[in-house]
């Protein structure tokens, strides 16, 4: 919005030209989202407390979590608000990639909101019925994936980028839709599963978004894309604005979500952020990179799959409790230790993922 306005005002004052610089807009996008989150935080927490929208804690969970019962949840609303406002202010409104991310972000946010609302009002830890949750997540993911396929069919936008290989970029064809679907839905659920401790999900999300900001900048720059042997995608540059908005909103939320948390993001935040990371990876053609950089989310999800599979097939559990962060809690690790160590691992994985762009 402000970019569009600046384009019309630059003929009156050349200083408005600064709004056309991607680096400037990336910085102010981060700061805008950060300040909105920090401003909304106390007001959102007070409002949620007044409405008695408190966290519902499972009775079979770690005993240390019982003290979290009643902590305000659905704080993801402030994250989504901060991201959306910042992106609308600082990104080019004509960029289709921006609208793809906002569609998934807001769509998954609405699904998460309904899920959270059922939990806090009905005091039901199950929330929205699983099949309906997956149905609506699938509708959004398939809709966006199909639209992207039609727009980018037989172009670099539908190729598969394989790490460590320069010239291995097979054209996916219709398999692009299937891959995009699994990445978007899978990442949404993976971040949702990770969001079980104070600050555990938001910081890896910030790290991955920051990593994708760098990738988006390189992908939208023809010289750097050619240098790194990745597809040049002319719309990708504006995803830098989206990624920095996620970073800013996430850091602002962490101010209130750090241990001991004053507010939880709820499904409205975790599903939306996961879906956003998924669609960003799809748009940048970096699904494999997401697996590396988002390794914490992958391991959390695999721990649940292995736990359920082992119990059904052998009648035995692999972990004391899944997702795996609860396993370490039950082993006696203090919650802050689990959180910070997972953060460290996440940061290392993002750096390793970025390094793979050069190792080809």
UniProtKB/Swiss-Prot annotation:
Job description of the protein: Catalyzes the initial step of the lipid cycle reactions in the biosynthesis of the cell wall peptidoglycan: transfers peptidoglycan precursor phospho-MurNAc-pentapeptide from UDP-MurNAc-pentapeptide onto the lipid carrier undecaprenyl phosphate, yielding undecaprenyl-pyrophosphoryl-MurNAc-pentapeptide, known as lipid I.
Cross-referenced InterPro entries: Glycosyl_transferase_4, PNAcMuramoyl-5peptid_Trfase, PNAcMuramoyl-5peptid_Trfase_CS
Keywords, alphabetical: Cell cycle, Cell division, Cell inner membrane, Cell membrane, Cell shape, Cell wall biogenesis/degradation, Magnesium, Membrane, Metal-binding, Peptidoglycan synthesis, Transferase, Transmembrane, Transmembrane helix
PROSITE patterns: MRAY_1 (PS01347), MRAY_2 (PS01348)
This protein's record includes keyword Cell membrane: yes
Organism superkingdom: Bacteria
TM stretches of this protein: 26-46, 72-92, 94-114, 132-152, 168-188, 199-219, 236-256, 263-283, 288-308, 338-358
Catalyzed reaction equations: UDP-N-acetyl-alpha-D-muramoyl-L-alanyl-gamma-D-glutamyl-meso-2,6-diaminopimeloyl-D-alanyl-D-alanine + di-trans,octa-cis-undecaprenyl phosphate = di-trans,octa-cis-undecaprenyl diphospho-N-acetyl-alpha-D-muramoyl-L-alanyl-D-glutamyl-meso-2,6-diaminopimeloyl-D-alanyl-D-alanine + UMP
Residues making up the signal peptide according to the UniProt record: none
Protein name according to UniProt: Phospho-N-acetylmuramoyl-pentapeptide-transferase
Molecular function as annotated in GO: metal ion binding; phospho-N-acetylmuramoyl-pentapeptide-transferase activity; UDP-N-acetylmuramoyl-L-alanyl-D-glutamyl-meso-2,6-diaminopimelyl-D-alanyl-D-alanine:undecaprenyl-phosphate transferase activity
Record flagged with keyword Transferase: yes
Protein family per UniProt: Belongs to the glycosyltransferase 4 family. MraY subfamily.
Organism: Klebsiella pneumoniae subsp. pneumoniae (strain ATCC 700721 / MGH 78578)
Cell compartments where the protein resides: Cell inner membrane
Entry EC no(s): 2.7.8.13
GO BP term, example: regulation of cell shape
One Gene Ontology term, aspect cellular component: plasma membrane
């Amino acid at each position: 919005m402000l970019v569009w306005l600046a384009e019309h005002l630059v003929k009156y004052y050349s200083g408005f030209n600064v709004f056309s610089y991607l680096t400037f807009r990336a910085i102010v996008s981060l700061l805008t989202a950060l300040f909105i989150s920090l401003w909304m935080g106390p007001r959102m927490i007070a409002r949620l407390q007044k409405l008695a929208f408190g966290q519902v804690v499972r009775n079979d969970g770690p005993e240390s979590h019982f003290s979290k019962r009643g902590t305000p949840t659905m704080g993801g609303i402030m994250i989504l608000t901060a991201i959306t406002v910042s992106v609308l202010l600082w990104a080019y409104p004509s960029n289709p990639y921006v609208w793809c991310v906002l569609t998934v972000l807001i769509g998954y946010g609405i699904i998460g909101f309904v899920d959270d609302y059922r939990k806090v009002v009905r005091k039901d830890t199950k929330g929205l019925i699983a099949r309906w949750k997956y149905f609506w997540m699938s509708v959004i993911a398939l809709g966006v994936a199909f639209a992207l396929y039609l727009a980018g069919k037989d172009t670099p936008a539908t190729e598969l980028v394989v790490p460590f290989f320069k010239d291995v970029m097979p054209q996916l064809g219709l398999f692009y839709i299937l891959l995009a679907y699994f990445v978007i839905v899978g990442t949404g659920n993976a971040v949702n599963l990770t969001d079980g401790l104070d600050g555990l999900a938001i910081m890896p999300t910030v790290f991955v978004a920051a990593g994708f900001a760098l990738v988006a900048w390189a992908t939208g720059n023809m010289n750097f894309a050619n240098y790194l042997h990745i597809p040049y995608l002319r719309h990708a540059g504006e995803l830098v604005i989206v990624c920095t908005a996620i970073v800013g909103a996430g850091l602002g939320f962490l101010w209130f979500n750090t241990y001991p948390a004053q507010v939880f993001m709820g499904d409205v935040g975790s599903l939306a952020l996961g879906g956003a990371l998924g669609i960003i990876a799809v748009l940048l053609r970096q699904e494999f990179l997401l697996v590396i950089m988002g390794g914490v989310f992958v391991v959390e999800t695999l721990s649940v799959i292995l736990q359920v599979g082992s119990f059904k097939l052998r009648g035995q559990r692999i972990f004391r409790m899944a997702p795996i962060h609860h396993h370490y809690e039950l082993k006696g690790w203090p919650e802050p230790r689990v959180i910070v160590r997972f953060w460290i691992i996440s940061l290392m994985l993002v750096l390793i993922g970025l390094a793979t762009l050069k190792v080809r």
